[in-house]
Amino acid sequence: MKKVRITAVRKASYPDLMALYENPMENACSVEEGAVFIANGWEKPEGLCDSAWQSMSAFVLTLACGGEDIYSGWMKNRHSAMISCNDGFRPVSFLLEAMEEEAEL
């Protein structure tokens, strides 16, 4: 089983939707663009929010176990995936990449 690099590549924000629908939040997403997390096999990396992990964990496990070409030709790199978290007000897009390094399980 391989490690998987998780990179926050884009963070969006929709203040108009927040104003219309969201109750104010004190501790909204703290992930910044460029942040890198390393998943050790199927284990959630420290510092990655639970909601983002729920969105990507199946893809991380697939890549960690050697899966490739998710959705038949979707990604240029067959050992990667682009996933966003479930936050509709401030979604973060994450690039997942299988690493050559073996997970330490």
Q: For each predicted feature, which ranges?
A:
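Helix-coil modules at protein/domain termini and other flexible surface or pore-lining loops
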Residues: 4, 29, 83-86
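Short, compact, well-ordered microdomains
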Residues: 56-105
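A short, structured loop/turn motif at beta-sheet edges
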Residues: 1-3, 30-33, 100-101
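Short, structured beta-strand/loop micro-motifs enriched in basic residues and often containing a Trp
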Residues: 2, 8, 13-22
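Short, charged beta-turn/beta-strand-edge "cap" motif at the junction between a beta-strand
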Residues: 12-13, 41-47
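A structural detector for beta-sheet-dominated domains
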Residues: 7-9, 40, 97-99
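Short, flexible N-terminal segments of the mature chain
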Residues: 19-44
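Intrinsic-disorder/low-complexity, polar/charged segments enriched in Ser/Thr/Lys/Arg/Asp/Glu/Gln
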Residues: 3, 36-38, 91-93
